[in-house]
C-alpha cells in the first residue's frame, strides 16, 4: 500500500496550434483540433502586438484543447503512433512534463485528409502527476509538492516506456 502514493499517472494532454494570424485560419485550426480530440477547442489570443506580423494584442492567433482522464491516455497512444513510437530524451523536463511536435496532423491514426482544413502541424504537451499533486492547485492553503515526491525526468521516461511502449531516442 505504501507504493500507491508513488504511482505516476497521465494528468492531461494539451494540443496547441499556433497559426499566427486571426480569421479563417484560427477556425480551421479549431476544426482540426476538434476532429483530433473529440472535444471543443478554445481560441488563444496574442499577448502583445507584433507590427511586423500584423498581429494585435488580444487577437485570436491560435487554438488549443486540453484532454484529461481516460480520453487522454487513448489520445496519447494515437499521438505516439503518429511519431513512430519515438520521443526524444531532451523533450522531458525536470518535473514530469514532456512535449513534442507533430508535423502533419493527418499522420495521427483515424484522421483523414480534408481539403477544407489542409495539412497543419501541432504541439503536444503531456503532464504527469502523482496522488497528492492537487495541493499545488487547490484554492485554499496551497502548498508545494515535496522534492522527494516530485516526478523526475528519469521516472517520467520510465513511465512512458512502460505504459505506452515508446522508445526514448
Swiss-Prot record:
Gene Ontology BP, a term: translation
- Protein name from the UniProt record: Large ribosomal subunit protein uL5
- The answer to whether UniProt assigns keyword RNA-binding to this entry is yes
The gene from which this protein is expressed is rpl5
List, alphabetically, the GO terms of the cellular component aspect: ribonucleoprotein complex; ribosome
In UniProt terms, what function does this protein have? This is one of the proteins that bind and probably mediate the attachment of the 5S RNA into the large ribosomal subunit, where it forms part of the central protuberance. In the 70S ribosome it contacts protein S13 of the 30S subunit (bridge B1b), connecting the 2 subunits; this bridge is implicated in subunit movement. May contact the P site tRNA; the 5S rRNA and some of its associated proteins might help stabilize positioning of ribosome-bound tRNAs.
Keyword terms of this UniProt record: Ribonucleoprotein, Ribosomal protein, RNA-binding, rRNA-binding, tRNA-binding
Subunit annotation: Part of the 50S ribosomal subunit; contacts the 5S rRNA and probably tRNA. Forms a bridge to the 30S subunit in the 70S ribosome.
Gene3D superfamilies documented for this protein: 3.30.1440.10
| GO MF, any single term | tRNA binding
Species per Swiss-Prot/TrEMBL record: Cenarchaeum symbiosum (strain A)
The record's similarity note reads: Belongs to the universal ribosomal protein uL5 family.
Amino acid at each position: 500500500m505504501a507504493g500507491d502514493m508513488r504511482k505516476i499517472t497521465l494528468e492531461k494532454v494539451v494540443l496547441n496550434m499556433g497559426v499566427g494570424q486571426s480569421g479563417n485560419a484560427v477556425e480551421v485550426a479549431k476544426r482540426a483540433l476538434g476532429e483530433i480530440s473529440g472535444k471543443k477547442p478554445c481560441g488563444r489570443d496574442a499577448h502583445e502586438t507584433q507590427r511586423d506580423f500584423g498581429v494585435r494584442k488580444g487577437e485570436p492567433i491560435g487554438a488549443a484543447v486540453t484532454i484529461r482522464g481516460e480520453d487522454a491516455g487513448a489520445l496519447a497512444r494515437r499521438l505516439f503512433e503518429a511519431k513512430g513510437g519515438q520521443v526524444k530524451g531532451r523533450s522531458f523536463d525536470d518535473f514530469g512534463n514532456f512535449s513534442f511536435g507533430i508535423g502533419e496532423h493527418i499522420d495521427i491514426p483515424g484522421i483523414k485528409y480534408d481539403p477544407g482544413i489542409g495539412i497543419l502541424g501541432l504541439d503536444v504537451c503531456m503532464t504527469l502527476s502523482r496522488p497528492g499533486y492537487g495541493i499545488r492547485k487547490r484554492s485554499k492553503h496551497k502548498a508545494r509538492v515535496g522534492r522527494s515526491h516530485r516526478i523526475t525526468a528519469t521516472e517520467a521516461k520510465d513511465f512512458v516506456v512502460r505504459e505506452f511502449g515508446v522508445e526514448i531516442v
